[in-house]
Amino acid sequence: MSVALSIPLLSLPEDMREALAAAAGPVYSGDRFRRQLLQTPCSGVACIGDYVSQACIATLSTAWTGPLILVVDGKTRRESWRDMVVPQGFRVHRVRSPPGSLSLEAYTTICKLMEEYGRHVVFVEGEEDLIALAALDCGIDWTVVYGLPGVGGVVVHRCLRKPGLENSSVLAFKPGTGVHHQSSP
């Protein structure tokens, strides 16, 4: 039996889908991607997506001692993927964020974790794609990494951008509520 819960969220306007599909920064793959991660000039790294998070762990596990956030939903290209093994020393968090939306729970969790400067894995029930916008919005001194399926990893060194020159795409989202179905015990 499942219980329907109403959760506050921000919905992606249809006319913004194409604009947000474009990379927010340079796209890298292979060794160039790994070098960008290893040479980050920022104080923390946030990796959004299952495949990208696995690549971040493989690249940064022994070489990076700074803050690290991994955000996963158990899917790649909307298909089930392997389970994320939580690395030792990481705190686990769970949020809900329906597809095509950014829940306020997910937004505030990411922003709060970026202020804490720890090591975290965030499991998303729903879809993690738009959580990259929360990381870009809140992670002023962070490197934000997310995947473009079939292309590579987008690496945005937010610490190198001048503050105040960019408007958050999140401001254009439509506030509302969404129904989330949760299994009852």
UniProtKB/Swiss-Prot annotation:
GTP binds at residues 50, 52, 73, 75, 128. Pathway: Cofactor biosynthesis; coenzyme A biosynthesis. Belongs to the GTP-dependent DPCK family. It comes from the Archaea. Pfam families: DUF359. Catalyzes the GTP-dependent phosphorylation of the 3'-hydroxyl group of dephosphocoenzyme A to form coenzyme A (CoA). One of its GO terms (biological process) is coenzyme A biosynthetic process. InterPro entries: GTP-dep_dephospho-CoA_kin. The keyword Cytoplasm does not apply. It catalyses: 3'-dephospho-CoA + GTP = GDP + CoA + H(+). The keyword Methyltransferase does not apply. GO terms for molecular function: GTP binding; kinase activity. Keywords: Coenzyme A biosynthesis, GTP-binding, Kinase, Nucleotide-binding, Transferase. It is an enzyme of class 2 (transferase). Its EC number is 2.7.1.237. This is GTP-dependent dephospho-CoA kinase.
